[in-house]
């Protein structure tokens, strides 16, 4: 077998500034893993004919390389009829340079990686993809098909330079993971709720340079979670980024989102709960640009789309929204600032600063606050935390609201009844910024 064009990676995990608590990423490089052992799925029965099931071959290759090695899926089209549970890996990498097409109909997760450490999944060509063909389910009104990718209890990991398309359910979930990095990804799903882009909970995880198209979560933090850094995110006709839904015993702290561009989505950022208990604190949401979104800054502690949970409410504190600009779809119907907190668990130490947004329809917009205390706009600055409700109506556009757009903004969604094309991964995910890390394809061809 010819030598693999493996991306040269640092031998040590990466340490970046921000809300992270330490280093992230694999402990050893793909080069060192390949030098230990290489397991090509073609040697285990895979055939790039878009017919033969790759599931068993991938499982066997994992078993052979899970104690240290690199699993290679060469360029070509592969059918996946049976799902894989890849468990117990130590110093293992998977290079996906081909395209996997869902043909099976089981629920669960097409690809589950669990109880593993020092793990990496990526494409040398930055074109490796999984096509879920979710529209086959969605056109029948079925949102209970499989997820594409789930990492569960995985530490010191990276997932990058791959494309996930049209999941029957969620696209990518990180469940109780730690010390990981996710970047240089394109996720493209159907125009329906329940088709989440990225959901993450765990500790010390960096998500950056990701584009998401769908109609539900773009990149969303769930609980429990701490020290999560999310930056350079392109929600391109999506549901938008969020936190939640939050329920009982919520424990989320040290979260930073920055450089998030949101176009034609449900919201720029939403913190959503209904009852429940626990806390969210020490969170910064800065450098947000929005255009054409239904909601902008949306904190809703009485979110009616979830069933109420027992408890006085999730306590939100020390949360800052900074440097937001752009336009919302209709500022009178859905104002750009909505901070509705629980009367029995008021929000405290909330800050809204450098916030300039204006309506695309009409000539007025509203700011609404309820039981929310802090500094800025309709927030009450008081030592008292008695319940209150206030709505401010503004008829003059704020200065500085105009913002740069992205050339790749979609002009329509992809619906739910037809196959969704596989996109390419962009090199910019926020106006004026290039990706923090170059695409793997650029590194391997340099």
UniProtKB/Swiss-Prot annotation:
Optimum pH is 3.6. InterPro entries: Glyco_hydro_28, Pectin_lyas_fold, Pectin_lyase_fold/virulence, RHGA/B-epi-like_pectate_lyase. Glycans are attached at residues 50, 115, 124, 236, 281, 318. GO terms for molecular function: polygalacturonase activity; rhamnogalacturonan alpha-L-rhamnopyranosyl-(1->4)-alpha-D-galactopyranosyluronide lyase activity. Its EC number is 3.2.1.171. The active site is at residue 216. It catalyses: Endohydrolysis of alpha-D-GalA-(1->2)-alpha-L-Rha glycosidic bond in the rhamnogalacturonan I backbone with initial inversion of anomeric configuration releasing oligosaccharides with beta-D-GalA at the reducing end. It comes from the Eukaryota. Pfam families: Glyco_hydro_28, Pect-lyase_RHGA_epim. GO terms for biological process: cell wall organization; pectin catabolic process. Disulfide bonds join 39-65, 218-235, 341-347, 369-378. Keywords: Carbohydrate metabolism, Cell wall biogenesis/degradation, Disulfide bond, Glycoprotein, Glycosidase, Hydrolase, Polysaccharide degradation, Secreted, Signal. One of its GO terms (cellular component) is extracellular region. It is found in: Secreted. It is an enzyme of class 3 (hydrolase). Gene3D superfamilies: Single-stranded right-handed beta-helix, Pectin lyase-like. Residues 1-18 form the signal peptide. Pectinolytic enzymes consist of four classes of enzymes: pectine lyase, polygalacturonase, pectin methylesterase and rhamnogalacturonase. Hydrolyzes alpha-D-galacturonopyranosyl-(1,2)-alpha-L-rhamnopyranosyl linkages in the backbone of the hairy regions of pectins. Belongs to the glycosyl hydrolase 28 family. This is Rhamnogalacturonase A. It comes from Aspergillus niger. The gene is rhgA.
């Amino acid at each position: 077998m010819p030598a693999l064009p493996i991306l040269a990676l640092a031998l040590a995990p990466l340490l970046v500034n921000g809300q992270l608590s330490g280093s992230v990423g694999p402990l050893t490089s793909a080069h060192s893993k390949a030098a230990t052992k290489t397991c090509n799925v073609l040697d285990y029965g895979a055939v790039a004919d878009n017919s033969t099931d790759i599931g068993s071959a991938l499982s066997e290759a994992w078993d052979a390389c899970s104690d240290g090695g690199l699993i290679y899926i060469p360029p070509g089209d592969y059918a996946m009829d049976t799902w894989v549970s890849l468990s117990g890996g130590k110093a293992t990498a998977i290079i996906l340079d081909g395209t996997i097409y869902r043909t099976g109909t089981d629920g669960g997760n097409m690809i589950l990686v669990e109880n593993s450490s020092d793990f990496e999944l990526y494409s040398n060509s930055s074109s490796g993809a999984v096509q879920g063909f979710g529209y086959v389910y969605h056109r029948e009104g079925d949102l209970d098909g499989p997820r594409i990718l789930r990492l569960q209890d995985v530490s010191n990991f990276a997932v990058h330079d791959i494309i996930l398309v049209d999941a029957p359910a969620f696209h990518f979930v990180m469940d109780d993971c730690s010390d990981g990095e996710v970047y240089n990804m394109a996720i493209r799903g159907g125009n329906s709720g329940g088709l989440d882009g990225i959901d993450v909970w765990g500790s010390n995880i960096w998500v950056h340079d990701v584009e998401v198209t769908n109609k539900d979560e773009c990149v969303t933090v769930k609980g429990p979670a701490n020290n999560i850094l999310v930056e350079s995110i392109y929600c391109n006709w999506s549901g938008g980024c969020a936190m939640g839904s939050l329920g009982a015993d919520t424990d989320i702290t040290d979260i930073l989102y920055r450089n998030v561009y949101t176009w034609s989505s449900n919201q720029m950022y939403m913190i959503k709960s209904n009852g429940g208990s626990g806390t969210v604190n020490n969170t910064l949401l800065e450098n947000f640009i929005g255009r054409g979104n239904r909601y902008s800054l949306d904190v809703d502690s009485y979110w009616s789309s979830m069933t109420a949970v027992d408890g006085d409410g999730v306590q939100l504190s020390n949360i800052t929204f900074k440097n937001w600009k752009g336009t919302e779809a209709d500022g009178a119907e859905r104002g750009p600032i909505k901070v509705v907190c629980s009367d029995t668990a008021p929000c405290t130490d909330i800050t809204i600063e450098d916030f300039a947004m204006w309506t695309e329809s009409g000539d007025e917009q509203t700011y609404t606050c309820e039981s929310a205390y802090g500094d800025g706009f309709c927030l009450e600055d008081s030592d008292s935390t008695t319940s209150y409700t206030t709505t401010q109506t503004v008829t003059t556009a704020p200065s500085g609201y105009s913002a740069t757009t992205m050339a790749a903004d979609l002009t329509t969604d992809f619906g739910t009844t037809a196959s969704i094309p596989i996109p390419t991964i962009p090199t910019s995910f926020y106006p004026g910024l290039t990706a923090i890390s170059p695409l793997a394809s650029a590194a391997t061809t340099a």
